[in-house]
């Protein structure tokens, strides 16, 4: 039996690591969840994701409720109060229980002398809640985004930025990809129905299913057998443009965690696929996905800027470049992105993308297809990136995705329930 732990203090420390130390929640959370019971795992995840999603609101409220901020070794208490406020605002946890557990969290973080302070701040919020929220809802903080990102979205999407922000602040739907080598989508939906769950097919992407209610993967029919994979609909859209064929040599660059590698092999089981990623740790997930789906591909660790180091002079029929990016299209799935990214990251990422494009283009055969994809919504990483590449690359031609003046296809977050995603299909003349 697992030791009873204070979930509020665990959530506070996790959020502090994201905001103060720049760590990714996807790295921090799984080890913490191993320390708690199954029933507490979901609540711990809800507290971490929820606080990060609404961080600017919770920060704003604390600044109104406290005369001075908590600093130094007491900084964790700031995040513990955030966890308390989040419960009072956004969960069905009875207020008395939320207060008691949050106050008790001070003991777990070795700050028992501050129990009275935490209790006082949360009770003050309860008394002033209506007037505080009215003031908050009249401020720019209500958009729950850092100001630098808000400015970029307003500039890029003067008509749509509010709907993008709204979508980013929602909980994401759960999308699945049915493995067509095992089942048709309709036959798998029938199995889902038999299991007491409901799903809906995507209108454009032939393997995509949206669950009516998110479910643990072990509850999905045939998950362990490789019949189905968790993957957002927009990410599945890459195959529409790549159109892999049996017998071709295909490069999946920046491949981890392997969702698109395995999708290529579902569409073209006889393709020769090379999956490359710079992050050796994340490559283990590519191996895991290939094993679960019973597929084979060549997997290598390598830097996309130096392809000769990992493929020599080899050329490919098709290349999928899922470029490193700001991930501003998947904020609803990873709310920590809002607080991990900085404005200065964008030109640095655009430069990296440009270098990878230039380096990998010679490794595409004449007549071959390169699909450039990102999970970003920022033009510097997307349409402007491809426009500049077309201008400096004489044998590159845009195909089916946009115009030379406005190249690529941009999916915005929440459109058809998918994530924000960009695709550009390029043909080598």
Swiss-Prot record:
Active site annotation, chain numbering: 375
Keyword RNA-binding listed: yes
UniProt: S-adenosyl-L-methionine binding residues: 254-260, 277, 303, 322
EC number: 2.1.1.176
CDD domains: AdoMet_MTases, Methyltransferase_Sun
Keywords, alphabetical: Cytoplasm, Methyltransferase, RNA-binding, rRNA processing, S-adenosyl-L-methionine, Transferase
Keyword DNA damage among record annotations: no
Catalytic activity: cytidine(967) in 16S rRNA + S-adenosyl-L-methionine = 5-methylcytidine(967) in 16S rRNA + S-adenosyl-L-homocysteine + H(+)
Enzyme class: transferase
Gene3D superfamilies associated with the record: Helix hairpin bin (1.10.287.730), NusB-like (1.10.940.10), Sun protein, domain 3 (3.30.70.1170), Vaccinia Virus protein VP39 (3.40.50.150)
Molecular function as annotated in GO: RNA binding; rRNA (cytosine-C5-)-methyltransferase activity
Pfam families: Methyltr_RsmB-F (PF01189), NusB (PF01029), RsmF-B_ferredox (PF22458)
GO biological process, alphabetically ordered: regulation of DNA-templated transcription; rRNA base methylation
Compartments (UniProt record): Cytoplasm
Family that this chain belongs to: Belongs to the class I-like SAM-binding methyltransferase superfamily. RsmB/NOP family.
Functional summary from the UniProt entry: Specifically methylates the cytosine at position 967 (m5C967) of 16S rRNA.
Protein name as catalogued: Ribosomal RNA small subunit methyltransferase B
Species whose genome carries this gene: Escherichia coli O7:K1 (strain IAI39 / ExPEC)
Upper taxonomic lineage: Bacteria, Pseudomonadati, Pseudomonadota, Gammaproteobacteria, Enterobacterales
